[in-house]
């Protein structure tokens, strides 16, 4: 089907804004498309893409502090470890919970810091 591009442009130029909006809506419906903006890929020499927002965090015990008994109690409550395992973890440090949400990581950090421990979230 041949068409005259300039004739089509001239005909569309006579439409009002409301008529154009109706035309666009009709074409979207006919073609099954949305008005989403296409994101261009990075050009040559462009900076590296921004890092994705982190969704999983690790809670790391750095130091149990002076009140180890309270820290051990919190470790047992958070992890479900036995007394010996919680005591060993409090002495050597390391990962308490891995792959948890930011909210949970902040909650665990607050609990352990309240007991006197030094905790990091990575």
Curated annotation (Swiss-Prot):
It holds the Pfam family Ribosomal_L12_N. GO terms for biological process: translation. One of its GO terms (cellular component) is cytosolic large ribosomal subunit. One of its GO terms (molecular function) is structural constituent of ribosome. Keywords: Ribonucleoprotein, Ribosomal protein. InterPro entries: Ribosomal_bL12 (IPR000206), Ribosomal_bL12_C (IPR013823), Ribosomal_bL12_C/ClpS-like (IPR014719), Ribosomal_bL12_oligo (IPR008932), Ribosomal_bL12_oligo_N_sf (IPR036235). The keyword Ribonucleoprotein applies. Belongs to the bacterial ribosomal protein bL12 family. Forms part of the ribosomal stalk which helps the ribosome interact with GTP-bound translation factors. Is thus essential for accurate translation. HAMAP family: Ribosomal_bL12. NCBIfam families: L12. Homodimer. Part of the ribosomal stalk of the 50S ribosomal subunit. Forms a multimeric L10(L12)X complex, where L10 forms an elongated spine to which 2 to 4 L12 dimers bind in a sequential fashion. Binds GTP-bound translation factors. This is Large ribosomal subunit protein bL12. It comes from Deinococcus geothermalis (strain DSM 11300 / CIP 105573 / AG-3a). The gene is rplL.
């Amino acid at each position: 089907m041949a068409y005259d591009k300039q004739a089509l442009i001239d005909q569309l130029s006579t439409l009002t804004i409301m008529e154009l909006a109706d035309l666009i809506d009709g074409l979207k419906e006919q073609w099954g498309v949305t008005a989403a903006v296409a994101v261009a890929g990075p050009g040559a020499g462009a900076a590296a893409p921004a890092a994705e927002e982190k969704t999983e965090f690790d809670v790391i015990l750095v130091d149990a502090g002076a009140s180890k008994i309270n820290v051990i109690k919190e470790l047992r409550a958070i992890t479900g470890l036995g007394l010996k395992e919680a005591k060993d973890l409090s002495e050597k440090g390391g990962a308490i919970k891995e792959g948890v949400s930011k909210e949970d990581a902040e909650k665990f950090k607050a609990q352990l810091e309240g007991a006197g421990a030094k905790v990091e979230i990575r």
